[in-house]
C-alpha cells in the first residue's frame, strides 16, 4: 500500500515537473489517471480488509470443527 502511494506520488511529481513541456489536456489526463488509480487502490484495500474477516471466520470454524472431531475421537477410545 505504501509502495503504491509512493509510486502515485512519483507520478504526480513527474507530471508537475513536465508541466512546462506538456499541454493542459495531458496534465488533466494524468490527473484523472491518478485519481482513478487511487480509487482502485482504495477499493482493493477495502476488499483485502473484508477478506481478512472472512479468513478469520473460516479459521474459527475450522478450529471448532477440529475440536469436535477431537472430542468424538476421545469418546471412541478403549
UniProtKB/Swiss-Prot annotation:
Residue ranges the record marks as coiled coil: 27-75
Molecular-function GO term, any one: peptidoglycan binding
Statement: the UniProt record of this protein carries the keyword Thylakoid: no
InterPro entries: Lipoprotein_leucine-zipper_dom, MOM_Lpp
Localization per Swiss-Prot or TrEMBL: Cell outer membrane; Secreted, Cell wall
Entry keyword annotation includes Translocase: no
Sequence repeats: 24-34, 38-48
Pfam families, alphabetized: LPP (PF04728)
Lipid-bearing positions (S-diacylglycerol cysteine): 21
Family: Belongs to the Lpp family.
Other remarks in the entry: About one-third of Lpp is covalently bound to peptidoglycan.
Protein name according to UniProt: Major outer membrane lipoprotein Lpp
Organism of this sequence: Escherichia coli (strain K12)
Amino acid at each position: 500500500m505504501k509502495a503504491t502511494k509512493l509510486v502515485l506520488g512519483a507520478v504526480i511529481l513527474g507530471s508537475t515537473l513536465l508541466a512546462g513541456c506538456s499541454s493542459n489536456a495531458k496534465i488533466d489526463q494524468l490527473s484523472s489517471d491518478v485519481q482513478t488509480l487511487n480509487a482502485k487502490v482504495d477499493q482493493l484495500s477495502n476488499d483485502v480488509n473484508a477478506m481478512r474477516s472472512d479468513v478469520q471466520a473460516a479459521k474459527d470454524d475450522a478450529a471448532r470443527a477440529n475440536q469436535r472431531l477431537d472430542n468424538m475421537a476421545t469418546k471412541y477410545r478403549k
